[in-house]
Amino acid sequence: MKITGIIVEYNPFHNGHKYHIKKTRSLTNCEGIIAVISGNFVQRGAPSIVDKWNKTKMALLNGVDLVLELPALYSLSSAEFFAYGAVSLLENLGVVKNLCFGSECEDIKLLTLMGKILYEEPEELKLTLKERLHQGMSYASARGNALKEFLCHRYSLKNNSITEMLHLPNNILAIEYCKSLARLKSTINPVSIKRIGNSYNSTYINNRFSSATSIRNFLKENNSLQELEKALPYNILCILKDLSHSNYRFTFEDSLLPYLKYKNLFYGKNIKYLPDVSEGLENRIESALKNASSYDQIINYAKTKRYAYSRISRILCQFFLGFENLDTKVLRKNRCPYARVLGFNNKGMEILKKIKQNSSIPVYTKLPKNANDMLKLDLMATKGYSLLNKNIAFNQDYISSPLIIDKI
């Protein structure tokens, strides 16, 4: 059975995601699709607008066969560790032939080359990176700058095209996926799909291909879901309407504010133990939490040229969930140690049987009695999310079985 993996967040699911699934099937000629999905917190450093069980339902109703949860440790990390966690999970299953992802650049050879260079870290690249960091650049900017100079010098590529390419978010993730495949010495074949529609950060609602950002902003500020009719698959619109009519609370970053401020009163000194905090950044964040009156104010006060909005927002989510209580810096350097099943259809059940025969890691359809440290963070993520979204029970992980949808 030819199986393709995809790495997704669905925050929320929209037409671009449906297009991705459809193109994945046609390009890879696969018989089944496994989606590794961020759970209740997503990589931009925010609670998911809807919970992971509803996201699983959205995925299964739109062409995915098996949904696995990306542990919170990886989903609340930089692109590098987000990609490594997800790719290592797919690799460990022992059944995945292709990894299909969207990017602004369709040149898979160039993306693979960039990933390989970043994994191998030639001396010339390391020296330039060190220089750019000394100049005060953020790590992501410094590394992108070093990679651009290396490619232009070693491979005679055009400066402007590389600069533009390295500033686009889906390209950045695509390169990290390729880097992770190189690091794992994986035989999984990377496949790139050209991203269409509005840019990732666009706030404009386009009739057909709107960004997740624009849809989230709309849901935050408007009550009329019908205006999203052309931006979402019909079944997704129905799910969101049903949730809205049942007084389901769509979840946004602002809801974190009182909990963060309260925790900061007693445990602010622990911020320095979070995995993405360095060079005194904890002092800026602790001060921001004391003085800010809104979530955006916290980030705008704490961020600098070197520490971007997304990094600060991830740190805030890590603090909210208690990442400082575990050795997360070590944990996230390791391969994903388990696969937790969130849902599947009939084809997904066949894939699951195949995985159980080939996987090098345990596959959980129900929670084990003794959770390892990484799984403990997943459980804490749901408990924390239940404070923000009152429709989710504190012990939801324990009372929810994988969602099973018959594919007709």
Curated annotation (Swiss-Prot):
The keyword Ligase applies. Transmembrane segments: none annotated. Its main location: cytoplasm. It comes from Clostridium kluyveri (strain ATCC 8527 / DSM 555 / NBRC 12016 / NCIMB 10680 / K1). Catalyzes the formation of N(4)-acetylcytidine (ac(4)C) at the wobble position of elongator tRNA(Met), using acetate and ATP as substrates. First activates an acetate ion to form acetyladenylate (Ac-AMP) and then transfers the acetyl group to tRNA to form ac(4)C34. It comes from the Bacteria. Pfam families: HIGH_NTase1 (PF05636). It is found in: Cytoplasm. One of its GO terms (molecular function) is tRNA binding. Coiled coil: none annotated. Keywords: ATP-binding, Cytoplasm, Ligase, Nucleotide-binding, RNA-binding, tRNA processing, tRNA-binding. It catalyses: cytidine(34) in elongator tRNA(Met) + acetate + ATP = N(4)-acetylcytidine(34) in elongator tRNA(Met) + AMP + diphosphate. InterPro entries: Rossmann-like_a/b/a_fold, tRNA(Met)_cyd_acetate_ligase. It is an enzyme of class 6 (ligase). This is tRNA(Met) cytidine acetate ligase.
